[in-house]
Amino acid sequence: SVGLAQLQPGDATQLVVGYTAAQGDHYLAVYSYTDGVLSTILEQQYQQYLVEDITGGGNQDLILMSTLEDGGVQIELLTVDKEGSFQQVAVMGLSANRFAGCASVAAGVGADGRHYLVLDGWTGISGNNLASVLLRFDEDTQQMVPADQISTEKLYTASLRNVPSLVSQDLDGDGIVEIPTQPDEAGLLNM
């Protein structure tokens, strides 16, 4: 994927490129074009990424998700400083007991006006089920924290689903991410 981003103050625009290497690993490269010179400002392995103003600072931020060696998920929030270098603002891990990887990530605004991330993670014994986590950036602690509208446990249970294509997304374009749920008997035929 290729996209343009406004990751730092001013008129400079960055080029964000996600690509797959020959061995199947995913990499993200961010380039800056200044005074006729294209330069790499970040190159990093990832599983999912998102460019969004999650900190509420007015510029877009870079959110990278990767799978840890123990199977958990790491969420990394990066911002660009005035010199054009990436700063790691926050890192958060999701337990391998719950998640085996990241299936998708979406960002939206809640009814309270805050910016939120919805992460859909692979879970279950087979690793083929999905469940969701709702996170927000806490300005006081400068960390990604679970949202307080619903407990992490309740959201995990309510969003547990066995249809891999049912990912969280803004379905109606209102800026709010819808999180799919699956009723207990969904997809079962009782005779």
Predicted regions and their residues:
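Beta-propeller-forming repeat regions
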Residues: 1-191
